[in-house]
């Protein structure tokens, strides 16, 4: 179950020496074709990392032969030398695979403002290219982890075609992708414009709705590569739906492993005048530290939910708002509903349902609680 499940892909993960302790920290994913179509979406942070700059440029023509990824260093805020380092990573990968550097995307994750150890990385790329195999997907997924505790992978099987994916990201999760590196592969025979449209829609309903801590990374990257090796061209809508489902699976895995969390929270907003309103309300609640602390404390504090809703520009009437926690409607018509003592928040998963009674649109935002461990982990994370 990995990026090498679809036909036409190989991968590898190696310990290049970027991290301490002989941990896997560099990965290569290679597309063997016969098609080399690709698409990408990236962080909307205006302070973006050198590998984001590089990858935006090379994916613009809709063609990729490989992706090289490293953890242990973001290569962000490193100036012109950092961009040259990203290019050198692509060049080394291209040399190892016999392709052009302009056909290789680059992704990095880790500390900001630190140059990468290029001697170790170049050597690691050489070894990774030599070790590429159909069995290398698990090592590749492990190599891109930073504060993640488990690798994130998913697969979808269509009629004669498939999609595979791997992701990393445990902190700085916020709409706009989420400190994420995601590589998606498919053996469907699709052209780049179809991939681009599908990826943007899939990201919109998945990664863009994951919001652990409201912080947007400099390095967010989601790449989709198609080998065409199956020879099957699925209907574009069928493919988009399948890709969206797989990305939602990966987004849930990211939230489940978010730094220091003790609850995974799904904030479902219904009865909105527009999808934008539903997303806006969900995100505002998800970013409320008071709300997140209440969940951590096992308190279904619907007042904090209403307070967060009230600062948005969404269409609603305050005396028509309903809020439920895990199926118990604790707020009805903007006031007191069922006793909050009926709500059980002892489990890891929490479902918050907000009905605006203003229309038919809906959206679900995924988030986490705010814990002592989250503060400790981020306070101790080296800068």
Where are these regions (language model features)?
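Generic structural marker for isolated residues within well-ordered, non-membrane alpha-helices
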Residues: 90
């Amino acid at each position: 179950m990995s990026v090498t499940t679809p036909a036409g892909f190989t991968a590898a993960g190696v310990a290049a020496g970027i991290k301490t302790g002989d941990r896997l920290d560099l990965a290569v994913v290679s597309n063997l074709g016969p098609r080399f179509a690709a698409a990408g979406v990236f962080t909307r942070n205006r302070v973006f990392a050198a590998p984001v700059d590089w990858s935006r440029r090379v994916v613009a023509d809709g063609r990729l032969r490989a992706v090289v990824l490293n953890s242990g260093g973001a290569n962000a805020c490193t100036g012109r030398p950092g961009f040259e380092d990203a290019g050198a990573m692509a060049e080394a990968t291209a040399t190892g695979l016999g392709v052009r550097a302009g056909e290789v995307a680059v992704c990095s994750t880790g500390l900001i403002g630190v140059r990468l150890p290029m001697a170790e990385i170049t050597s690691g790329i050489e070894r990774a290219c030599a070790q590429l195999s159909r069995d290398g997907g698990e090592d590749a997924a492990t190599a891109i982890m930073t504060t993640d505790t488990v690798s994130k992978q998913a697969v979808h099987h269509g009629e004669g075609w498939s999609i595979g994916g791997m992701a990393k990201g445990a902190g700085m999760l916020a709409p706009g992708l989420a400190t994420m590196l995601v590589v998606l592969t498919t053996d469907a025979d699709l052209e780049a414009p179809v991939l681009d449209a599908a990826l943007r829609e899939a990201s919109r309903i998945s990664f863009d709705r994951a919001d652990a801590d409201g912080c947007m990374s400099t390095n967010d990257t989601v790449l989709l590569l198609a080998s065409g090796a199956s020879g099957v061209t699925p209907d574009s809508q069928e493919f988009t739906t399948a890709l969206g489902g797989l990305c939602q699976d990966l987004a849930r895995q990211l939230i489940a492993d978010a730094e220091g969390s003790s609850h995974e929270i799904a904030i479902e907003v219904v009865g909105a005048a527009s999808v934008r309103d539903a997303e806006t309300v969900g995100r505002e609640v998800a970013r409320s530290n008071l709300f997140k602390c209440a969940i951590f404390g096992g308190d279904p504090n619907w007042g904090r939910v209403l307070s967060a809703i009230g600062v948005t520009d969404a269409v609603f009437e305050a005396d028509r708002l309903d809020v439920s926690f895990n199926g118990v409607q604790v707020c009805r018509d903007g006031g007191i509903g069922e006793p909050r003592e009926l709500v059980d928040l002892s489990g890891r998963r929490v479902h918050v349902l907000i009905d605006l009674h203003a229309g038919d649109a809906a959206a679900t935002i995924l988030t986490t609680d705010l814990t002592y461990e989250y503060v400790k982990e981020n306070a101790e994370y080296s800068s």
